[in-house]
């Protein structure tokens, strides 16, 4: 089996927009932890346009947040792709639809007086939308992430690191990585097949020097730590040639266009919904994190070598309408028994998930580059001993 996954640097136009959307979201949550927000950003040709819905749009300095985010990434001149100091900023922010707000605030169960419906009951809040999400975990890395996306993220992060630390001072913010691995008959990663790096750079640098520097300073340090067989690997660094014009001046950026980069690469399914710019009442956010949290606990309990968790919701309903798991034949107990144990131990109602993972905090800008999963700074990446013991006991 061959598996390929890609990542992008924080300066990629789409990732720039993800970070702007989530930086604004963090600012909104700082003012009101119960705020609702769905923030989209588009960037191109020296213009940044934010639009969407926010329950308290006047509470934050949106232009100030946008400029700071752009400058922190490293876009300080139009020559690099956009200048955070001088770019044009446009806002089209409205409040959330009352119909949607009512559906979230008063669930179908609440309106029909079903179940435990006390004033602070987790059943009172409904899902912010319909849809399905997928969570995944496996034994390929200590982080329980697929190895191809893990390597791709490390390469993209390393590109930004050597730029910001002036190790390769001629690099500019835009960049991408892609990794192809070969798997053995037991579906374990075995060989490094191909690495692709595209790095934006200043006009003055020689292309051969750039290729050598990136191979030695970025690629080899990351790859050498993997233990993969690299004897037949192909390394393609800036295979298109020079990459001087980059960032939003070369390609317009848009929030939510790197959803596979954000999750598990090509190793798992995706429900199609983006995460960035959305407050934790949105199922693309709370349910995606919950599905990952559950998947990690199943693997940590040694009930499967890998698992894909699917959760589906209806707008305005607190309880999921569907739940499924796929262990790709690696389960150590019967699937129906494992599924019952998960549903017994974990509470999938939106308010319960938000409470369990402490999601009403300004944590989201950090998720918007180098993946939402695989970093233990996030609550959904941490194994809860009580949940793990409960899961072990439930089977």
Curated annotation (Swiss-Prot):
Binds 2 divalent ions per subunit. Binds 1 potassium ion per subunit. Residues 96-106 are annotated as: Flexible loop. L-methionine binds at residues 53, 96, 251, 282. It holds the Pfam family S-AdoMet_synt_C. GO terms for biological process: one-carbon metabolic process; S-adenosylmethionine biosynthetic process. It is found in: Cytoplasm. GO terms for molecular function: ATP binding; magnesium ion binding; methionine adenosyltransferase activity. GO terms for cellular component: cytoplasm. Signal peptide: none annotated. ATP binds at residues 12, 174-176, 242-243, 251, 257-258, 274, 278. It comes from the Bacteria. InterPro entries: ADOMET_SYNTHASE_CS (IPR022631), S-AdoMet_synt_C (IPR022630), S-AdoMet_synt_central (IPR022629), S-AdoMet_synt_N (IPR022628), S-AdoMet_synthetase (IPR002133), S-AdoMet_synthetase_sfam (IPR022636). Its EC number is 2.5.1.6. It catalyses: L-methionine + ATP + H2O = S-adenosyl-L-methionine + phosphate + diphosphate. Belongs to the AdoMet synthase family. Homotetramer; dimer of dimers. Catalyzes the formation of S-adenosylmethionine (AdoMet) from methionine and ATP. The overall synthetic reaction is composed of two sequential steps, AdoMet formation and the subsequent tripolyphosphate hydrolysis which occurs prior to release of AdoMet from the enzyme. This is S-adenosylmethionine synthase. It comes from Tropheryma whipplei (strain Twist) (Whipple's bacillus).
């Amino acid at each position: 089996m061959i598996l390929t996954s890609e990542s992008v640097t924080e300066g990629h136009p789409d990732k720039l927009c993800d970070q702007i959307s989530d930086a604004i979201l963090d600012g909104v949550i700082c003012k009101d932890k119960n705020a609702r927000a769905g923030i989209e950003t588009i960037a191109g040709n020296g213009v940044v346009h934010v639009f969407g819905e926010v329950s308290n749009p006047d509470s934050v300095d949106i232009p100030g947040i946008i400029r700071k985010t752009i400058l922190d990434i490293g876009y300080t001149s139009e020559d690099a792709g956009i200048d955070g100091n001088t770019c044009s900023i446009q806002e089209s922010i409205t409040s959330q639809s009352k119909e949607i707000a009512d559906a979230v605030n008063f669930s179908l169960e609440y309106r029909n007086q079903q179940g435990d419906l006390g004033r602070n009951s987790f059943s009172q809040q409904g899902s912010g939308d319909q849809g399905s999400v997928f969570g995944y975990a496996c034994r390929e890395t200590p982080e329980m992430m697929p190895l191809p996306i893990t390597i791709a993220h490390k390469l993209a992060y390393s590109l930004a690191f050597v730029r910001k630390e002036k190790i390769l001072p001629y690099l500019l913010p835009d960049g991408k990585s892609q990794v192809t691995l070969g798997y053995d008959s037991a579906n374990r990663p075995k060989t490094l097949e191909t690495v692709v790096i595209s790095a934006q750079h200043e006009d003055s640098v020689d292309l051969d020097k750039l290729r050598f520097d990136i191979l030695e300073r970025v690629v080899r340090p990351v790859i050498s730590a993997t233990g993969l067989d690299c004897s037949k690997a192909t390394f393609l660094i800036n295979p298109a040639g020079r990459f001087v014009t980059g960032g939003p001046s070369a390609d317009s950026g848009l929030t939510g266009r790197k959803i596979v980069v954000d999750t598990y690469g090509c190793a798992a399914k995706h429900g199609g919904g983006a995460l960035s710019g959305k407050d934790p009442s949105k199922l693309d956010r709370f349910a995606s994190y919950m599905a990952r949290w559950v998947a990690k606990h199943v693997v940590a309990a040694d009930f499967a070598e890998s698992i894909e968790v699917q959760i589906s919701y209806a707008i305005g309903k607190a309880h999921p309408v569907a739940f499924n798991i796929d262990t790709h034949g690696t389960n150590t107990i019967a699937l129906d028994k494992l599924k019952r144990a998960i549903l017994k131990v974990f509470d999938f109602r939106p308010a319960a998930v938000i409470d369990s993972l402490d999601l009403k905090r300004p944590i989201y800008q950090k998720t918007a580059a180098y993946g939402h999963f695989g970093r233990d700074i996030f609550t959904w990446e941490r194994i809860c001993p009580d949940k793990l013991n409960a899961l072990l006991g439930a089977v």
